[in-house]
Swiss-Prot record:
GO terms for biological process: glycine biosynthetic process from serine; tetrahydrofolate interconversion. Homodimer. It catalyses: (6R)-5,10-methylene-5,6,7,8-tetrahydrofolate + glycine + H2O = (6S)-5,6,7,8-tetrahydrofolate + L-serine. InterPro entries: PyrdxlP-dep_Trfase (IPR015424), PyrdxlP-dep_Trfase_major (IPR015421), PyrdxlP-dep_Trfase_small (IPR015422), Ser_HO-MeTrfase (IPR001085), Ser_HO-MeTrfase-like (IPR049943), Ser_HO-MeTrfase_PLP_BS (IPR019798), SHMT-like_dom (IPR039429). PANTHER family: SERINE HYDROXYMETHYLTRANSFERASE, SERINE HYDROXYMETHYLTRANSFERASE 1. This is Serine hydroxymethyltransferase. The keyword Zinc does not apply. It is an enzyme of class 2 (transferase). It comes from the Bacteria. Coiled coil: none annotated. Its EC number is 2.1.2.1.
Amino acid sequence: MTTPRDNLAILAETDPVVYRLIQQELNRQRDHLEMIASENFTSPAVLAAQGSVLTNKYAEGLPGKRYYGGCEFIDEIEQLAIDRAKQLFGAAHANVQPHSGAQANFAVFLALLQPGDTIMGMDLAHGGHLTHGSPVNVSGKWFRVVHYGVDPQTERIDFDQVRDLARQHRPKLIICGYSAYPRIIDFAAFRAIADEVGAYLMADIAHIAGLVATGHHPNPVPICDVVTTTTHKTLRGPRGGLILTRDPELGKKLDKAVFPGSQGGPLEHVIAGKAVAFGEALQPSFAQYSAQVIANAQALAATLQRRGIRLVSGGTDNHLVLLDLRSVSAVLEKNGAADPVMTGKRADRLMEEIHITANKNTIPFDPQPPSVASGLRLGSPALTTRGLGPAEFEEIGEIIADCLFQPGDPGVLEACRRRVAELCRRFPLYPHLG
């Protein structure tokens, strides 16, 4: 059996241009601190499954009900992924075929809604997601969208607003689950509101699935009608999507919405990677990993706060930290900086200069447009996979604060780069790839 390293050697010989670019990306991942909250590093076993001969096989349909022959082993692999997903999340039904979280969400809409129906989701600027009704997404074009947000004082979900909007607009579907919300989600509170107005309730747990699977965040599967997620992020699997439900009859509708409703042939090499990742997540070591993800994020948050950087909602309960950079601007202005305005766009570029990968992000009631933003989103999953602990995340917090508070000092930026390089050296990534 060939290994990922063998495959790269073959690629180097047959297509050196692609090989060189892959090696450059590998080096970038090794030499930078990956802090994008939606990214992680899959295991070598997941990489091996994705790079297997399963990529050759078409398998439209479901296990035991295919439209192509030669699927006997494909069926076993996909059924294994289904069974492991059900066990991991306590679901009665799982569909492992969605190519992405966005595809999973679209399949739910196709199964439950008609064009023109009303949906409710969190405002993108408050931590929602494009697929929850943004006007640039199909969800915002096909459906009537009502957005809820967070309380201006606490920056936590405003359930009074959610209830009032639900009573006023009577949505067919309420969506909970977010892309930039650092707090525990009260699924039971959403269930009560959905039941009152006769709405379906969908949880999108793409960001927190790994934490849910290990009990470090409440599980929406017993509460919500349907749950969607990606399989990477905190779940640490391949890039892909997953749909879960406690209702087998609803599961049949969801299956049809995936195929033939919105997709053709499933990506069975990716599904094999999902099966491997779900198996890894069922191990005790993964629960330890999830606990460390939260501890590391909280260590980072405490350091940033100690340095005078304000965090949205005042901290974090999960894997992500959202910085309100207006607090940095205030310090820069007080210190007489030539350019005192620190935006998400500027902070993103500064992070790149010191080899930290992050992303600008809107914050609740943001005065800046999304292309500029007033926030910086940081996450702990990838570096936790790499082996960093709270002490290292405290060091990273100091590095980030030094960079943000002294953005015009080349000496400070160079010192930050050296500190980042030392952390990368101490915690190597994918050494088996050479």
